[in-house]
UniProtKB/Swiss-Prot annotation:
NAD(+) binds at residues 71-76, 105-109, 129-130, 142, 151, 169-172. It is found in: Cytoplasm. This is 3-dehydroquinate synthase. One of its GO terms (cellular component) is cytoplasm. Its main location: cytoplasm. The lineage of its organism: Bacteria, Pseudomonadati, Pseudomonadota, Gammaproteobacteria, Enterobacterales. Zn(2+) binds at E184, H247, H264.
Length: 362
């Protein structure tokens, strides 16, 4: 069992990583006997894990209600969020309730925002079931729903009480979702840890076949890196922005193509190549390093080009609505070397459009 602490003073919390956690009531601390829980999951995961998690919580003496949401990025919306509020109010659940997010990034982000908003804030626990949510979205307290004009535009910073990562969940993960999660894994190597990127080049095949020790190390290392960044910059005023490598381009793809048509990790993968091409055009990143990124993404089964039907110009309106924009200026996360990156303002729109075009004609 691995245990990592996100250090945020009184709001510090543990990330527990192991197989078989759904069999242990102690995995769901700080829940105690007699407490009330609203378990939030989706239609895909409910048949797989709802009864198991409900059972282990009830074994601990917790009173469990549940709400089952539709599955898909297109349902990460205010309308679906309202169904969670309705379920909480119908019981009713008070300020002493705990929301448990059992699912991937959509369930986790939406449940976290529900917890931040319901009666001005209740406790919640993240139980991520996809690789992407285990290595990234469940850690750090970013919660949100989408708006038709932009991804994650309505949300809050709100930290969970704990994160419970049961590695056994990956056994039921579809290959496309596994690849999507690997995009965020590869991101950590590019922006923060060149040695980890080297390890990924050597061990990607083991991750693709869900090798237990390799996957446990991979998730632990990603969570360590994320925890360090969040502890240093919880509200994304500086260092934490680096975690958005590829996201300015990727969110544009997701919004333009319709939420759910491109998985988040797929869009981020293409976006990371666009960021690398931008950095190349600025003369601060080598084509050889871009090729290393492209090769690793391709091996993971990820796209390295944007959608053919989306023109370079179509990216700009979305990028100008990006949450990192300051004073009307796009801020990009750009690699300087494998393992090192920067936040860059003032890049000309023409250069950015040319970098996007590089990734459409490649």
């Amino acid at each position: 069992m691995e245990r990592i602490v996100v250090t945020l003073g009184e709001r510090s919390y543990p990330i527990t990583i192991a197989s078989g956690l759904f069999n242990e009531p102690a995995s769901f601390l700080p829940l105690k006997s007699g407490e009330q829980v609203m378990l939030v999951t989706n239609e895909t995961l409910a048949p797989l894990y709802l009864d198991k998690v409900r059972g282990v919580l009830e074994q601990a003496g917790v009173n469990v209600d549940s709400v089952i949401l539709p599955d898909g990025e297109q349902y990460k919306s205010l309308a679906v969020l309202d169904t969670v509020f309705t379920a909480l109010l119908q019981k009713p659940h008070g300020r002493d309730t705990t929301l448990v997010a059992l699912g991937g990034g959509v369930v986790g982000d939406l449940t976290g925002f529900a917890a931040a908003s319901y009666q001005r804030g209740v406790r919640f626990i993240q139980v991520p079931t996809t690789l992407l949510s285990q290595v990234d979205s469940s850690v750090g307290g970013k919660t949100a729903v989408n708006h038709p004009l932009g991804k994650n535009m309505i949300g809050a910073f709100y930290q969970p009480a704990s994160v419970v990562v049961d590695l056994d969940c990956l056994k039921t993960l579809p290959p496309r979702e596994l690849a999507s999660g690997l995009a965020e894994v590869i991101k950590y190597g590019i922006i923060l840890d060149g040695a980890f990127f080297n390890w990924l080049e050597e061990n990607l095949d083991a991750l693709l076949r869900l090798d237990g020790p390799a996957m446990a190390y991979c998730i632990r290392r990603c969570c360590e890196l994320k925890a360090e960044v969040v502890a240093a910059d919880e509200r994304e005023t500086g260092l934490r922005a680096l975690l958005n490598l590829g996201h300015t381009f990727g969110h544009a793809i997701e919004a333009e193509m319709g939420y759910g048509n491109w998985l988040h990790g797929e869009a981020v993968a293409a976006g990371m190549v666009m960021a690398a091409r931008t950095s190349e055009r600025l003369g601060q990143f080598s084509s050889a390093e871009t090729q290393r990124i492209i090769t690793l993404l391709k091996r993971a089964g990820l796209p390295v080009n944007g959608p053919r039907e989306m023109s370079a110009q179509a990216y700009l309106p979305h990028m100008l609505r990006d949450k990192k924009v300051l004073a009307g200026e796009i801020r990009l996360i750009l690699p300087l070397a494998i393992g090192k990156s920067e936040v860059r303002s003032g890049v000309s729109h023409e250069l950015v459009l040319n970098a996007i075009a590089d990734c459409q004609s490649a």
